[in-house]
Design a protein with these regions (language model features):
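A gly/proline- and charged-residue-enriched helix-loop-helix capping module
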Residues: 127-140
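N-terminal secretory/targeting leader peptides
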Residues: 2-128, 145-366
Length: 366
């Protein structure tokens, strides 16, 4: 759906909801305002997880309220209806009508989907929204997912993440060798090339894996979520920045067959609810991370450190190699990479004299 059509649809949905008017399908002339739907949403998140999990639950509530209960959505935490990392397949085959997760969880099946979550040293949260909503990214995403019988919608944003929790100090490149680390997506592939053993485990297993030594290090999100999982009690060293996930976007995926059964006004309301959820989640993380960071700074058992420059330089070099190989893998990856990289280039130039320049100035005087 083009952005102009999307905004027009939102206005139609808002007007119909506020005024209580009948909704008549333009192509059939049939009044569908009394039709009701009960859907299931599967997610990758532990129950009640701040930000990610609660964001999915709030999305469902927002849709139900805006549709006057015409569309009710029951939310399942990861593992309740399907495994946490099986959301994509479950929604594609119709086990559930909706799913809430991160596109890079399915990189084995849809490699190019990683562009729609996060790319190492790539777009930050605001830049991702700009590319998706105005730069053609969302249209590419929707077209790419058609072959899997899915409709993707941006539905959450955490902002830049942290580099991860480590049970040993990282003072040089050599310290990465042999580490067993939970880090998904392209960041995981980059870390593998740096000598790390990349391991994928769902959020619910990270704490125990760190405690038992099954993991030496783990990247999850940032202070807000990491504290909620107790990761500060399982590892001592907390490194930044989140070079691998500068602006990770979450996705709502809808089974295409189910989507096609919805009246146009309900489709527009779902899209509007996702856009509101995207904004709300980013605000929640900005606030929650700031507060949780203060807690960690006051914890004598936690050391917050920057990754050494030589480590970041190596990770950037390896990231460039990984992304180049991904873009050469298939036609879809090449198309999406070109769109993404073209916008990253011009946006980075703008950031130098806007956001980055301001933050540099503020830090120099505060």
């Amino acid at each position: 759906m083009k952005r102009r059509e999307f905004v027009g649809g939102l206005a139609l949905a808002a007007g119909a909801t506020a005024c209580g008017k009948q909704h008549v399908e333009a192509d059939t002339g049939i009044d569908r305002s009394t039709e009701t739907f009960k859907w299931n949403m599967v997610t990758s998140w532990p129950p009640g997880l701040p930000g990610l999990g609660v964001g999915a639950e709030n999305l469902a509530k927002r849709v139900e309220k805006a549709t006057n209960s015409r569309l009710k959505i029951k939310v399942y935490a990861g593992g309740e209806l399907v495994p946490a990392l099986d959301v994509f397949d479950a929604v594609s085959r119709g086990t559930a009508q909706m799913g809430h997760d991160a596109a890079y969880y399915h990189r084995g099946k849809v490699p190019a989907a990683q562009y729609f979550t996060a790319i190492p040293f790539g777009l930050n949260a605001n830049e991702m929204n700009a590319w998706l909503y105005y730069g053609g990214g969302l249209e590419l995403w929707q077209e790419y997912y058609e072959q899997f019988n899915l409709v993707p919608i941006p539905a959450g944003q955490t902002g830049v993440q942290m580099g991860g929790w480590f049970n040993k100090e990282i003072n040089s490149i050599e310290d990465l060798a042999g580490l067993k680390m939970r880090i998904p997506g392209l960041g995981g592939e980059v870390m593998q090339r740096a000598g790390v053993t990349q391991i994928t485990v769902p959020a619910s297993e990270i704490f125990t894996s760190l405690q038992t030594g099954a993991l030496d290090a783990a990247e999850w999100v940032g202070p807000y979520n990491d504290v909620s999982l107790g990761l500060h009690k399982a590892a001592r060293y907390y490194y930044y920045p989140g070079w691998h996930e500068p602006g990770p976007t979450l996705e709502l995926i809808v089974n295409k067959d189910a989507w096609d059964t919805l009246p146009d006004d309900l489709k527009a309301i779902v899209e509007l609810a996702c856009q509101a959820g995207n904004l709300d989640m980013q605000a929640e993380y900005n606030y929650g991370n700031a507060r949780a960071l203060q807690q960690l700074k006051n914890d004598p058992n936690v050391e917050i450190r920057p990754l050494p420059d030589d480590v970041l330089k190596l990770l950037y070099k390896l990231s460039t190699e990984v992304i180049d190989e991904l873009s050469a893998r298939d036609e879809w990856s090449a198309r999406i990479q070109k769109s993404y990289a073209d916008f990253l280039d011009v946006s980075a130039q703008n950031q130098l004299i806007s956001e980055q320049a301001f933050l540099n100035a503020r830090s120099s005087v505060m």
